[in-house]
Amino acid sequence: MKFVSNVELIKKFYTAFKNQQKDIFLDMCDEKIQWQSAEGMPNGGTYVGKQEVFEKYFPDMLSNFKEFHAIPEQFTDMNDHVMVTGKYSGISNKDKSFEVQFSHVYHIQDNKITRFRQFTDTQKIQESLK
């Protein structure tokens, strides 16, 4: 799958993930993708490989929420990196809602996402879990 730009790749990744098009978003990722979720997030830490990221981290993390949305607002091309700013919104299993800004940094190599790093105010998300 070849995209015009790294920004286009990341935009399509968010769309495919939102629409649960697993085959599409998995194809956009390197087999050995490194996914670094903020330490204060539920199940935060570093995960390596598609299986660990998408079959362990995401199901475990999302199991804390009735709704969890990552809403990208701005995409910035930085050569082999793309920075995305936006907001998370959702409702925890404790019926507490939250909205918090995020920054995501993606590293792209050979038209595949090889690394992800998350920056957000994890305290607001943690408060919704209490």
Question: Which positions does each model-derived feature cover?
Answer:
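Short, low-complexity N-terminal intrinsically disordered segments enriched in polar/charged residues
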Residues: 1-31, 127-130
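A solvent-exposed, acidic/Ser-Thr-rich amphipathic alpha-helical stretch
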Residues: 30-78
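Short hydrophobic/aromatic-rich beta-strand segments that constitute the beta-sheet cores
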Residues: 35, 84, 115-116
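Hydrophobic/aromatic beta-strand elements that line small-molecule binding cavities or substrate pockets
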Residues: 70-75, 87-89, 101-107, 117
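Short, cysteine-centered beta-strand-loop-beta hairpins and adjacent loop/turn segments enriched
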Residues: 90-98
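Short beta-strand edge/turn micro-motifs at domain boundaries
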Residues: 104-127
